[in-house]
């Protein structure tokens, strides 16, 4: 029965499908917000007519894309679908908790949308800094609704993380060691640990903000002995691991895609890849204050955070060069998924280089809160995370659905998207270097040309998103079934057929140990 299958589901494949559908839907909402932002900035002068509304749209765009698009698709969608198949587990360790993790998200999303509709909305930016987020500058229920929304999304992610950690550590076949696991499994494991350690700190910070707003506490109010900088420390101690949470599953997916379409049976430097991910996860926790170079820290503090941030480039470089080495000498198949993966490597590297620039505290003091920062993190998110999601989706779509996408359309869609995102975000580096600040709805005429180009790019990206919806419809309408899958010996998720039966590995997988 429909309700029993989808509302009360305890099946990792069905829950993964729910996550993918929810993430796609939220992605449309987030894209709509971003189009509104670029429409406002397409030329000087006012379009929306109100800076508060503009800032509400910017805030909503960030929250929707991070908490309701990237995380549900990467961790909830691909994670749920692939982890049990890749380690030969019959399902997740806690199947009912898995269901709850998903069903906490729609109410959370609803609360976020509600927060935009009451009073004047939450126009604080996704960081929700006090005193702007306090009860004077943002009177009314809006910020409180946003905080509740974050609480629900946070609980969902924490439960999900516990579930993945338990599944990966406990539900492998006895002969399978940690170092026999596919890289995507490793990436989700590291991501889950990051979630488990960082989200409680965010919960503490926003709960204190909630009591500051409603119960007259003064955690972040200097008038009562508090300090708004404390909030920034708490937020960014979560916020920096969060950006690695958004990209690490992408690393895992790209490793699989690059290996598969290079015709290799394993990625180059498996152990290096694993340790690089663990290093990135660890280092991600000790660099948070590089988001706060402008709040007046001591010079030695800034020196430490600059150096520590730059160290992250080393394991990241290990991954990039290992992907290139995996490609080397391979029998390369130019499938759409491979194109997304190669686009990921190229554009993520550019985003990483601008990150190294921003790691220098002296430079960051000039570039902080300019469009240079926006360009940097959209290169790693809008062209890192999103390209990985697109590549993973196209690569594993036959596994999820049993049908194949039209490769010609998929390549056209990649090309349109590639042009669109680059035209959107490359000019923003120039705007930032010229000093155009973030989070303003208008700008001096001198910035017009690059902003117009950027807005043109965003509309091209919108065409690519619509093309993707068309491609998915076309695949289900044409019903081209998968005939044969190559390289299944080293890509075990395909072993049960396309799509796999509702229940897989009902008796444990037999793994022969080579160690």
From Swiss-Prot:
GO terms for biological process: electron transport coupled proton transport; mitochondrial electron transport, cytochrome c to oxygen. The chain crosses the membrane at residues 12-40, 51-86, 95-117, 141-170, 183-212, 228-261, 270-286, 299-327, 336-357, 371-400, 407-433, 447-478. Heme a3 binds at residue 376. Its EC number is 7.1.1.9. This is Cytochrome c oxidase subunit 1. Fe(II)-heme a binds at residues 61, 378. SUPFAM superfamilies: Cytochrome c oxidase subunit I-like. Belongs to the heme-copper respiratory oxidase family. O2 binds at residue 244. Keywords: Calcium, Copper, Electron transport, Extinct organism protein, Heme, Iron, Magnesium, Membrane, Metal-binding, Mitochondrion, Mitochondrion inner membrane, Respiratory chain, Sodium, Translocase, Transmembrane, Transmembrane helix, Transport. Component of the cytochrome c oxidase, the last enzyme in the mitochondrial electron transport chain which drives oxidative phosphorylation. The respiratory chain contains 3 multisubunit complexes succinate dehydrogenase (complex II, CII), ubiquinol-cytochrome c oxidoreductase (cytochrome b-c1 complex, complex III, CIII) and cytochrome c oxidase (complex IV, CIV), that cooperate to transfer electrons derived from NADH and succinate to molecular oxygen, creating an electrochemical gradient over the inner membrane that drives transmembrane transport and the ATP synthase. Gene3D superfamilies: Cytochrome c oxidase-like, subunit I domain. Component of the cytochrome c oxidase (complex IV, CIV), a multisubunit enzyme composed of 14 subunits. The complex is composed of a catalytic core of 3 subunits MT-CO1, MT-CO2 and MT-CO3, encoded in the mitochondrial DNA, and 11 supernumerary subunits COX4I, COX5A, COX5B, COX6A, COX6B, COX6C, COX7A, COX7B, COX7C, COX8 and NDUFA4, which are encoded in the nuclear genome. Binds 2 heme A groups non-covalently per subunit. Binds a copper B center. It catalyses: 4 Fe(II)-[cytochrome c] + O2 + 8 H(+)(in) = 4 Fe(III)-[cytochrome c] + 2 H2O + 4 H(+)(out). The gene is MT-CO1. Pathway: Energy metabolism; oxidative phosphorylation. Residues 1-11, 87-94, 171-182, 262-269, 328-335, 401-406, 479-515 are mitochondrial matrix.
